[in-house]
Amino acid sequence: MNILGLYGGFDWDANKSFNEHQDLTWTHDAGATLISNGNHISSISQERLTRIKYDGNFPQESIDYCLSAGNLSYEDIDLICVPSMCLTIWYKQYYEGTITKKLTSLFPNAKIKFVSHHLSHAASAVFSCDFNEGSFLVLDGAGSLLYSYEFKDTQHVETNSIGYFNKKKSIFRFFPGIHNVNEFGSYYHSLSHKIYCEKIQKQINGYDEKYRESWDGKIMGLSAYGSHIEFTEDLKDCQLSKELVYDEVPYVTFEGRPYKENHTFKNADEKAYILQKNFECALLDYVTELKNKSYLDDYICFAGGSFLNVLGNSVLKQSGLFKDIHVPPYPNDVGLHFGAACFGAFQNKEEINLPKNIALLGKNYTQEEIEQELQNFNLDYQKYENFEELCEFTAQELNKNKIIGWFQNRSEFGPRALGSRSLLMHPGPAKNKDIMNSRVKHREYWRPFAGIVLENHLNDYFVEDFCSPYMLYSLTVKKEKKNEIAAITHVDNTCRIQTVTKELQPEVATLIQKFKEVSGIPVVLNTSFNDNGEPIVETPEDAIKAFNNLDIDYLVIGNYVVKKSEISYL
């Protein structure tokens, strides 16, 4: 059976916050996934193809991308799996039949299946994990509206959902959790917006199309700058300030606990720190309570946008509550269509087969396609027949503090660049963080850069000993190694790290091994291959355009190396 999961707006402009009737229309992270006879073919986010950050519109380009990858036509699709969303306009079109009519007109032979928002999140984690049996927890801002069938008078949404699965026995039990207010995701998001405005001393509408999906990550990075405060018991559940109280719920904090008396904080840095620490404490308390009540097993999958918070993930990882934890590389809404497609295949009793590296689900472009694009742009390039020699050259240039645009293998699926569509640099000199930021990324100064480390050298550089193959954990840098990787060490001595092996990512692992041979350091600075506010590059054409527009020194794409004709240095 050919199954297509798709997510996005339908007959409305989903990139606008409101329509002419002031209905909320904002949708983000549209895309599509194709599974054929249980085999994963392709997953892609719409933004990577349209070049519109967080694009939420109907994923036409994503559908075509997936069908092309599977060499299929619209008539070949047997089942469409559509995650629902927390928008009244979506439900209006659902009940009017608009969504079904649009899909059946495109896919004449397909059945349509609608899947709960949180169920789609859960499935994205369950069917990408290594264990066959366990439980799951979904936490985000808001999932599906539930008033239509469970509650008659009041609108409720999924916020905290749990469940149990056994793949061998084809068991998947889902229990949507309903809270009226203060779900982890929306509370953190709302306060992050207000703290960010205070930090930059500028009022920005919470639905501003440039910023609206980015507050959380910015404030998580800022929180380290307030870590000089000792987080004592009296700061747990404290009110940050009257100006920062969540508008709709002025007197409660995470999970509805009452505020303690108001405290005075000097600046936005301290407020960001207190918000983050309260998030971590509330998350750990909540998960501990569920575990103690036997709602969660020893093997756990986490999904939902709240699990992009790497600091919170790290607290759970170190808690000792579970024998194994799985967070997929796409825990946020990016993974919804993937999860919905997987759930459709599961219900069809198909065994789901994913690539060995579950983060690399996009297209792998051929050397011929790459060379053709280089010729289309009239670029001078050098081709390496031996990939190790290419990595040796690249490692030598990294050791000279050059900025490398790195384009290899299948593209990443999810919000992180994981060594396939990355910008790389030497992690040692502290100034390299500022050089990368001023020349290329143009981000807020307080946001750190991540690193990639060879897995077998993880314990040489970091205190914690757990792997982080999808950059979903933050680890503590050992004191004696801080200066060696200063450009990726945050002000609180942590690093958002990715661990790699040659088995899962041979290209970037080979490069880092060669870099270790010339520098002595088995780590590189890694950030996404894009400018601030742009999607990560997807195609060779995207990479070449970014190379031409950004102040980077080399483009290493497939077996080809392109050098900037004029290189500027700070």
What are these regions (language model features)?
Residues Y54-N71, A282-V287:
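Short, well-ordered amphipathic alpha-helical segments that serve as non-catalytic structural scaffolds
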Residues N2-I3, G9-D13, S17-K53, T98-K113, ...:
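Flexible beta->alpha loop and helix N-cap segments adjacent to enzyme active/binding sites
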Residues Y273-D298:
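Phosphate/ATP-binding catalytic cores across multiple sugar-kinase/actin-like superfamilies
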Residues E261, F265-C281, T501, Q505:
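Short acidic-aromatic active-site loops that bind/stabilize oxyanions
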Residues E47-F58, E270-K277:
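Active-site pocket-shaping loop/turn-to-helix segments
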Residues A69-S105, A123-S124:
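Short beta-strand-loop/turn "lid" adjacent to the catalytic site in phosphate-handling enzymes
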Residues Y74-M85, L296-G305, G405:
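Short glycine-rich phosphate-binding loop at a beta-alpha junction
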Residues E233-K266:
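A mobile "lid/hinge" subdomain adjacent to the ATP/sugar-phosphate binding pocket shared
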